[in-house]
Amino acid sequence: MRFVLKRLALFVVALFGLSVVVFAALRILPGDVASVMAGVNSPPERVTQLREQLGLNRPLIAQYFDWMSALARGDFGTSILTGRSVTSLVGARASITFPLIILGLLIALAIGLPLGCAAVLARSATVRAVFHVLAIVGGAVPALWGGLLLILLFGRGVGLLDVFPSQGFPLDGWGAPGSAISALVLPAVSVGIIVGASLMRYTRAVLGDLASSGYIDMARSCGMTRTQAVLRVGLRLATPQLVSVIGLTFASMVTGVMVIENLFALPGIGNGLVTDVGNRDLIAVQSELFLLAAFFLTVGLVVDLL
């Protein structure tokens, strides 16, 4: 119980610190936000009105506490450019990003865990070297390059095999589940290959250490083969570490798929955040960054408590 309370206290402190960092970082950016949002040829009266609307004419400490009090009420603000609430914007984008990273993570697990186990169990030095090269190449391939290659191979209208949509998301979203899933296949594979290579390296490292430990020797002395001992005993012992890595990987993928979302023209969280930053939509950006930070910290807290 004491550990749980300590972790919760650290979570609150970290969340407060991140809110200060997000708020301060957006205020020290060069250029006047109100002038940029109003437009180049806007009259000074419009800029002044926009500064009052955004609360930029108030002291910084007052602006921060206004923002914090609004967050405490569940009010994440309204985008100046679109007029939509930040909650609805993030919700719409999350309905694309989270299925993408879940599908990508499933592909990564299907690649990383079996290959990591196989790399540990391989007796031939040549086979182990092949697995080592696969892990390095898979992790070194840039997401942009890998995505472009998949589009050229499988993209509908431009690829050799003409199988999956190469860009965009259905206008009716998940109203057409088949089309929505089809649009996520190539992006998810792009993500899955890169993340899968990292999971393969980590699985190989963890199981490799356990394979030479006394636990495996004890299991083998009970009549298990080396393969049985590694897969039954080793994997069970490695599960807490693997769960921690998978959880943190899932959290980091929310913004990590930003390049993939831009490449495949998916209106997800990362793509939307880039657009909002480019448009200097201050209210939307600061709330989106805070929500992303809170999500990452929450996943880290859950992983620690498991």
Where in the sequence are the language-model features?
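Alpha-helical transmembrane segments of integral membrane proteins
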Residues: 1-2, 12, 90, 94-127, ...
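Hydrophobic alpha-helical transmembrane segments of membrane transport/permease proteins
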Residues: 14-65, 154, 158-180
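Juxtamembrane/transmembrane-helix interface segments of polytopic membrane transporters
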Residues: 18, 22-26, 147, 151-159, ...
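Membrane-water interface at transmembrane helix exits
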Residues: 22, 26, 30, 34, ...
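Transmembrane helix irregularities
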Residues: 29, 138-141, 254
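An internal, D/E-rich "acidic patch" concept
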Residues: 57-113
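Membrane-water interface segments at transmembrane-helix boundaries in multipass membrane proteins
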Residues: 133-198
